[in-house]
């Protein structure tokens, strides 16, 4: 294979829609339960369009500064897609700590420690939507929906009582209950934008 062919995608390799999903703390590598439910729901709402899914590669441990590693990985994949699949509509998504990863790459509130791969200025035109679940920034009054760049195309879902995103939350089970209703709600929102 010629060296120039490495890392490039052909049109048939490019999905119509690509979900970049960052899983939550202690979820097994991959999309996790919430990411899988969201991607499945979205596939059922976009007709015959193809939906790819990229699982952000990062530790997702209780060392929350590792969210920067996830942000660097997500940003790298997003930039790859923009450069190699310019017609693919991107959807950025995450759950819990993974929502924090999406916060970091979208600069809400500011890039985190160790994040050194910011998105170039042309990326927002390729991002159709952002959907996050149990976002820690929401607890601080900084949901993605207030972003001047991303707000109109963002849905930042917090179950009532979720202690990670609800300032009055005290129900850990609420934090685990995003598959189903909330993932379907987010898929409806995103399907209207892609």
Regions found by a protein language model. Name each.
Residues 72-151, 155, 164:
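Serine-dependent carboxylesterase/thioesterase catalytic core
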Residues 9, 54, 155:
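A broad, low-specificity signal marking well-ordered, structured residues that form hydrophobic/aromatic
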Residues 2-3, 101, 183-187:
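Hydrophobic alpha-helical membrane segments, chiefly transmembrane helices and signal peptide h-regions
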Residues 5-8, 188, 192-194:
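N-terminal charge/polar-biased segments
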Residues 13-89, 160-183, 187-192:
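Active-site catalytic motif of lipid deacylating hydrolases and related acyltransferases
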Residues 2-17:
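C-terminal region of N-terminal signal peptides and the immediate post-cleavage residues
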